[in-house]
A protein has these predicted regions:
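Sec-dependent signal peptide recognition
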Residues: 4-10
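Flexible, processing/modification-adjacent segments and terminal tails
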Residues: 23-48, 54, 91-152, 209
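N-terminal secretory signal peptides
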Residues: 39-51, 60-62, 68-72
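Short hydrophobic/aromatic-rich beta-strand segments that constitute the beta-sheet cores
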Residues: 42-44, 69-73, 88-91, 142, ...
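An acidic-aromatic
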Residues: 60-110, 173-177
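Gly/Pro-enriched, hydrophobic low-complexity segments
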Residues: 119, 123-127, 132-207
Length: 211
C-alpha cells in the first residue's frame, strides 16, 4: 500500500541523538542535548496505524545540524528525500519522478526539523510539555508551535540515554512509531547529500521561484 505524501514527510524523522547522562530531562534541556551532536546516521522502522490498518516501512537516515538530511526508504516505497536546507527534493524511482519543494515547506512538517535545526530554531518551533525518567528509560512530550504543522504531538523515548523511538500523532489522527537502531554520531562526508536524478526523470517544481 502506497504511503500518502503527507505521511511520508511526517516521518522525516525525528531521528536524533543520545541524551547525556548528566542532563536531567525535567530541566527542559532536551533541545540542548539534541543539538549537541552535528552528525546522525541510523536505520529505522516506521509503523503507521490508521483506521485499524498497520503499515510498515524501513529505511536509512543521514542528518547534519547544518540543515541537511537524507532519508532512504526501502521496499515497498524505495523513495529518497534530501535537503540541504535551501530546498527539499523527493525522488520516486518507480514513477521516474523528482519533486522539488521550497525551504518554507520544511517548516510546516514539524518533526523533520528536529534533525536539522539549531537550538534557537528548535525552541522557536517546538515546546516541551513534560519529561519523565524511570531507571534507564526516559521520555519527553513535545508539541509544535506552528499551527500549520502536520503533527499534533510527539513523544521522544530514550533508553540508556540513547534515542530508542518516537511516537507521534498527526492531524489525521494517525499514530506513527519510528524505532531506531545502529545509531551513530560519527562524521561522514557531505557528498551523501548530493543527488543527481537519472536522465529522463520528470522534474516537478512546487514553487515558481525554484524553476
Amino acid at each position: 500500500m502506497k504511503f500518502s505524501k503527507k505521511n511520508i514527510f511526517l516521518l522525516l524523522l525525528i531521528f536524533h541523538q543520545p541524551i547525556k547522562s548528566e542532563i536531567n530531562l525535567s530541566d527542559s534541556d532536551l533541545f540542548k542535548t539534541l543539538t549537541s551532536h552535528i552528525y546522525l546516521k541510523a536505520t529505522f522502522n516506521q509503523q503507521t496505524l490508521s483506521q485499524g490498518i498497520l503499515r510498515q516501512v524501513e529505511g536509512k537516515i543521514f542528518a547534519s545540524r547544518e540543515g541537511k538530511f537524507r532519508i532512504e526508504y526501502l521496499e515497498p516505497l524505495n523513495e529518497v528525500f534530501i535537503s540541504k536546507g535551501n530546498q527539499l527534493i523527493k525522488y520516486d524511482p518507480l514513477l521516474e519522478q523528482l519533486e522539488i519543494f521550497p525551504a518554507s515547506y520544511l517548516l510546516s512538517q514539524g518533526i523533520v526539523n528536529l534533525i536539522s535545526l539549531d537550538l534557537y530554531s528548535l525552541e522557536k518551533y517546538f515546546q516541551i510539555v513534560s519529561c519523565n525518567e524511570i531507571a534507564t528509560k526516559s521520555s519527553c512530550k513535545i508539541i509544535p508551535r506552528n499551527k500549520e504543522s502536520f503533527i499534533k504531538s510527539a513523544e521522544i523515548y530514550l533508553q540508556k540515554n540513547l534515542l530508542n523511538k518516537i511516537i507521534f500523532i498527526d492531524n489525521f489522527e494517525q499514530q506513527v512509531i519510528i524505532s531506531f537502531k545502529d545509531l551513530s554520531h560519527h562524521f561522514f562526508e557531505d557528498t551523501i547529500f548530493e543527488f543527481e536524478a537519472p536522465i529522463g526523470t520528470d522534474v516537478i517544481y512546487h514553487s515558481k521561484d525554484l524553476q
